A protein has these predicted regions:
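Generic detector of short, locally flexible boundary/turn motifs and exposed helical patches
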Residues: 29-34, 68-71, 92
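Active-site segments of SGNH/GDSL-like serine hydrolases
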Residues: 55-80
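Secreted/periplasmic serine-hydrolase-like ester/acetyl group-modifying domain
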Residues: 1-61
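Long, positively charged, glycine-interspersed low-complexity recognition regions
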Residues: 77-146
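Membrane-targeting and insertion segments and their boundary/processing signals
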Residues: 24-28, 62, 66, 100-108
């Protein structure tokens, strides 16, 4: 489990420093949902298994787990394959118990284009507009206190 977390961190850091984030909407969608040959990618069985292990580990340790989808631009959301959205929603709901595992899906939050750095990342303006909503939600769930 620790090796998996280290690998994920290494991959995320590498992507940030090599510029493998951002780009045009076409580039972003292709990177997230299609392989090099243009074939559609679903979450892998490995990803699904690791999610299950994370949920189990959090429950064992009596930790709250928040499965979270950040706000994205309308254009981005329109391009996400519906089968991907349905599968990720289904996987998340499979684990939600509203006591320790929560699913916060903010992809439908409507923010103006001025709030986005690119199609799937908020900029500073967006962060300042969105953070109070997230804080209120976490407070209502009892995950954080005011």
């Amino acid at each position: 489990f620790k090796n998996c977390v280290a690998e994920i961190k290494r991959n995320v850091i590498e992507r940030i420093f090599t510029g493998a984030t951002g780009g045009t909407l076409d580039v972003i969608i292709d990177r997230h949902y299609y392989d090099d040959k243009g074939a559609y990618l679903l979450p892998s069985s490995f990803q699904q298994e690791m999610l299950g292990r994370i949920v189990e580990e959090c429950k064992k340790r009596d930790l709250s787990l928040i499965l979270y989808n950040a706000p994205v631009s309308t254009e981005y959301m329109e391009r996400v394959p519906s089968s991907y959205r349905e599968l990720t929603d289904s996987l998340a709901r499979e684990y939600v118990d509203d006591k320790t595992v929560f699913y916060l899906n903010y992809t439908a939050v409507s923010l103006p284009d001025s709030c986005y750095r690119d199609a799937d990342h908020l900029n500073e303006i967006g962060i300042h507009r969105f953070t109070p909503l997230l804080k209120d939600t976490l407070t209502c769930l009892g995950v954080i206190s005011e």
